[in-house]
From Swiss-Prot:
Domain of life: Bacteria
Pfam families: GidB (PF02527)
Cross-referenced InterPro entries: rRNA_ssu_MeTfrase_G, SAM-dependent_MTases_sf
One GO CC term on file: cytosol
Gene name of this polypeptide: rsmG
Protein name, as recorded: Ribosomal RNA small subunit methyltransferase G
Amino acid sequence: MADATPGAEYWTALGWQPSTEQVDQLATLQTLLREWNEKVNLTRLVEGDDYWINQVFDSLWPLAHELKTPHQPRTCIDVGTGGGFPGLAIAIALPGSHMTLLDSVGRKTAAVEAMASRLGLADRVAVRTERIETTGHDRACRGQFDLAMARAVAAAPVVAEYLVPLLKPKGEALLFRGQWSEEDTTEFSSVISPLKAQLTGVQTCQLPAKRGIRHLLRVQPIGSCPSSYPRAVGIPSRTPLGS
């Protein structure tokens, strides 16, 4: 028996009405995640609301603007994709996008690559197995993305250093956060200035079923990111900007 998929209230709260095919893909992704989780420790958020709210909803709610133009061509990268979120959910929701999934753990990238293939996304989902500090200096990636995103990876200044070098001049970095305050905004806006970037917006969402408050930071370039960023492997996390 197939797992139940969310009802109309869920999609209304998300502000997105997926096609039947997209709902089927998201349901299939749950099944694939469950299968791969038996081989590789990808995530504990696989069943019921853990999957549909904490994985799918939490991946898509910040993209209300982008979901209005799903077929618009976009180059996207999900840094530290882990079990494939938010990247695979966004690739399903934005069929015009080309998504790169990045993780330094080969077992995880092998799993998400296999899942993308089973979902019929292989033609527009690429997978890279390497540290983001290396990716940020690769000509194939540096300055090449419309959207660069990271969810549950590291402190915000660290994530900004990972993402900003990947952006096109008019691209955006999407930093998925849990708790966030006005004090955080003030401090973060200051520490990212060496990246030649600015915080352009903070979005807030109360997840359904009282699953907690989430925030999204949108960061855009205001100039060319200096070639010294990201710093060498391990340094951004050991010595975050502003520390």
